[in-house]
Amino acid sequence: MSATGGAKSFTPPDIAKAKGKAPIVCLTAYTTPIARLLDPHCDVVLVGDSVGMVMHGLPSTLGVTLDMMIMHGKAVRRGLERALMVVDMPFGSYEEGPEQAFRNAARVMAETGCAAVKLEGGESMAETIRFLTGRGIPVMAHVGLTPQAVNAFGGYQVQGRGEDGDRVMRDAQAVAKAGAFSVVLEKVPEPLARRITKEIPIPTIGIGASPACDGQVLVVDDMLGMFTDFRPKFVKRYAELAEAAEAGIAAYAKDVRQRRFPAPEHVFSDMPKPVKGGEAA
């Protein structure tokens, strides 16, 4: 897919129709400036609950609240024109049952202006996905490693190795049958991701999965080198912005301490500035 050439925003049906075609480009965003940078290049922009770790300093995504997601969703919405905006449903906002999920997802959509929500889980979430999609809320699913279940998994291990691959396959099939328009496959063996992509009718979006997936997603702070606490194996760094920022900050601090900033060109005189017509500014 391509988010260039035309002003029309992508919709969930557009993404669903991309199955088997040009790869879907997806990145996360949490702020208006980053959303503006992503919009010309991305088909999908995900307001991920990873915001809790990369922007709020939380140790996991479990402490992210619905209000946090809505706040960041509003900011991202202001920066998008073309890309489809999807907002993560945070831990505790949908697991209780379909009614709770609908109530909170409807609030997220109404207050952020997003076009879809994403929730984690496979067979266990099929009923909820069916309930939401049947009431006008498009759902992007998420199977494999689901970070909100990190305590149940005992860590961030690869999911679906050996016989466990059948479980991940069933999860992917279940969310597709329930009506999800796409599914994120996170941290699963490459052959399994390839097989799931071939066998289910909805687009797969990989993160630590396979180049054969119908699309790819990364956390923008990871791929731009802004989040440096740790670096997952599946992340490719396309820039090193933290290093550049640190160098700029150090240069600024040095100039201030040596009274080289502000320089004459950065300050104002007490004389009126001439303008056209001889009038003073």
UniProtKB/Swiss-Prot annotation:
Cofactor list: Mg(2+)
Keywords noted in UniProt: Cytoplasm, Magnesium, Metal-binding, Pantothenate biosynthesis, Transferase
NCBIfam families: panB (TIGR00222), PRK00311.1 (NF001452)
GO biological process terms held by the UniProt record: pantothenate biosynthetic process
Catalytically driven reaction(s): 3-methyl-2-oxobutanoate + (6R)-5,10-methylene-5,6,7,8-tetrahydrofolate + H2O = 2-dehydropantoate + (6S)-5,6,7,8-tetrahydrofolate
Gene: panB
GO CC, alphabetical: cytoplasm
Organism: Chelativorans sp. (strain BNC1)
Protein's name in the database: 3-methyl-2-oxobutanoate hydroxymethyltransferase
Subcellular location(s) of the protein: Cytoplasm
Disulfide bond sites: none
Keyword Iron: no
Subunit structure, interactors included: Homodecamer; pentamer of dimers.
Cofactor note: Binds 1 Mg(2+) ion per subunit.
Main localization, broad class: cytoplasm
UniProt cross-references to InterPro entries, sorted A to Z: Pantoate_hydroxy_MeTrfase, Pyrv/PenolPyrv_kinase-like_dom, Pyrv_kinase-like_dom_sf
The protein's Enzyme Commission number: 2.1.2.11
Protein's pathway: Cofactor biosynthesis; (R)-pantothenate biosynthesis; (R)-pantoate from 3-methyl-2-oxobutanoate: step 1/2
Positions that bind 3-methyl-2-oxobutanoate: 49-50, 88, 118
